[in-house]
A protein has these predicted regions:
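Anionic coordination/interaction segments
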Residues: 1-140
Length: 140
């Protein structure tokens, strides 16, 4: 009998995105989001990463060097906490995926009947990241 391997990632049909299905692949999978002003955000499949500024000579100035970029979700009734991208709590979720695309990264997971989505992108100008965060309670 042939063993079925769990798919870690795949590229979308248009080739613009890499979708990662394993929150803990053998190595981090980073997306680099940047703009014309030199702001760059490094985003892993868990959502963490560094932010920095590159000047015209490509000198790097670190803005966020502690890799911390996490959202915590808590269900008080179930007394359970977790993260969309698994880390740093590393609690098991029912479903998980990270889409690294041109211009954004999106992490999605479901746990305890709560769907969560977190999108990160860098605007065309300025020195900031924009995060959009959505929750949907699918339970009664």
């Amino acid at each position: 009998m042939e063993r079925m391997e769990k798919k870690i990632y795949e590229f979308t049909n248009d080739g613009n995105s890499c979708v990662i299905y394993d929150a803990k692949p053998p190595r981090y999978w980073f997306n680099y989001l940047w703009n014309e002003n030199g702001y760059c955000a490094q985003v892993s499949q868990n959502g963490h990463g560094r932010s920095y500024y590159l000047n015209e000579r490509a000198d790097m100035c670190m803005i966020n060097n502690n890799d911390a970029r996490y959202f915590y979700i808590r269900d008080d009734e179930m007394n359970k906490s977790w993260n969309i991208g698994a880390a740093p709590l590393n609690e098991q979720v029912e479903s998980y995926q990270c889409e690294h695309s041109i211009g954004f990264s999106r992490l999605q997971s479901e746990c305890q009947g709560i769907e969560s989505s977190w999108r990160i992108f860098v605007p065309q100008t300025g020195f900031q990241e924009v995060w959009t965060f959505r929750l949907r309670n699918k339970s009664d």
